[in-house]
Swiss-Prot record:
InterPro entries: RsmH, SAM-dep_MeTrfase_MraW_recog, SAM-dependent_MTases_sf
Domain of life assignment: Bacteria
Lineage, highest ranks first: Bacteria, Pseudomonadati, Pseudomonadota, Betaproteobacteria, Burkholderiales
Entry's localization field: Cytoplasm
Organism in which the protein naturally occurs: Cupriavidus pinatubonensis (strain JMP 134 / LMG 1197)
Name the record gives this protein: Ribosomal RNA small subunit methyltransferase H
Length: 332
């Protein structure tokens, strides 16, 4: 998928990032049950199905009704899809036992960015919606029309890492009080113009609205909360030897993924001062339950072919048996 506001590609075109690398890392047994937590337009799912044998199965998840419609074009008895966030995979798959692998391709897809009516990008004028699931929840415009100034500033600061968050929040609230052509923000163009006035300096090569749009999208869709829940659910569902493959597109996502994997890849007494002081034998110490298999970034050719891939980072881990020994070395 992709970060918000990247350079536009032809309308509604989508190129799956790290396609071969992700599927190679994920599928280790052709008769396993796998989860594609972010179906999108089905690039990874179709490639996974091509690798599975007749006894394999793939369960996909997606919030976006357009993705669910696209999934309907896959006529394969081994495939099913849930119109739900991947954060709910634990509940949805509770009766299916353990799975052989889980893939999460985070962020936003090119069709979502390039469809003006979705309101994800400042490059196209449209309603300020930003919902992944257009059938539920409030839009970005609705939230900005009612949120407290300090809450708006916090979201833009924490999720956009925007140093002008306070100024932007003040401008948004002031705009709500304006008569005539003022009032609450309604379109992507409204928000982009307001941010451009509030941000006093420009980062080279980046539109001043980039961080604000990212922050609002993350907040409206609860992306980081879903990621934390989804990682735990995936870990609990994985069988021994199962693979967790996560592709992230910005530092907030990657930081959560890296910390989650690292926490399970080192003996757990590292985080418990009492255990560190206890005179335990090595055999008595908590053992790692994930082995880190690497960190992959797109090659130069993929980035040249698909500029939206440039910020992608893929991390891979393998579930270990509870009594497994050894320490996974976390890549940088």
């Amino acid at each position: 998928m992709s970060p918000t506001g990247s350079p536009a590609t032809p309308a509604l075109r989508h190129r799956t990032v790290l396609l071969d690398e992700a599927v190679e890392a994920l599928v280790w047994r052709p008769d396993g049950v796998y989860v594609d937590g972010t179906f999108g337009r089905g690039g990874h799912s179709r490639a996974v199905l091509a690798r599975l044998g007749p006894d394999g199965a793939l369960v996909a998840f997606d919030k976006d009704p357009a993705a669910i419609a696209e999934a309907g074009t896959i006529q394969d008895a081994r495939f099913s899809i849930e119109h739900e966030s991947f954060a709910a995979m634990g509940e949805r798959l509770a009766g299916r036992g353990h799975v052989a692998g889980v893939l999460l391709d985070l962020g936003i897809s090119s069709p979502q960015i390039d469809e003006a009516a979705r309101g994800f990008s400042f490059r196209f004028e449209g309603p300020l919606d930003m919902r992944m699931d257009t059938t539920r929840g409030i839009t970005a415009a609705e939230w900005l029309a009612q949120a407290e100034e300090q809450d708006i500033a916090r979201v833009i600061r924490d999720y956009g890492e925007e140093r002008f968050a306070v100024q932007i929040a003040k401008a948004i609230v002031a705009r709500r009080r304006e008569p005539g052509d003022g009032g609450p923000l309604a379109t992507t163009a409204d928000l982009a113009a307001l941010v451009a006035k509030a941000v006093k300096t420009r980062e080279k090569g980046q539109d001043p609205a980039t961080r604000t749009f990212q922050a609002l999208r993350i907040h409206i869709n609860q992306e980081l909360e879903d990621l934390e829940r989804g990682l735990k659910a995936a870990y609990d569902l994985l069988q021994v030897g199962g693979r967790l493959v996560v592709i992230s597109f910005h530092s907030l996502e990657d930081r959560i993924v890296k910390r989650f994997m690292a926490a399970h890849a080192r003996p757990q007494q590292d985080a418990d001062p009492a255990l560190r002081r206890a005179p335990l034998r090595a055999a008595d110490l908590p053992q790692p339950t994930l082995r880190l298999l690497g960190r992959v970034k797109p090659g130069a050719q993929e980035v040249a072919d698909n500029p939206r891939a440039r910020s992608a980072v893929m991390r891979v881990a393998e579930k270990l048996a509870p009594a497994a020994s050894g320490r996974g070395a976390a890549p940088a």
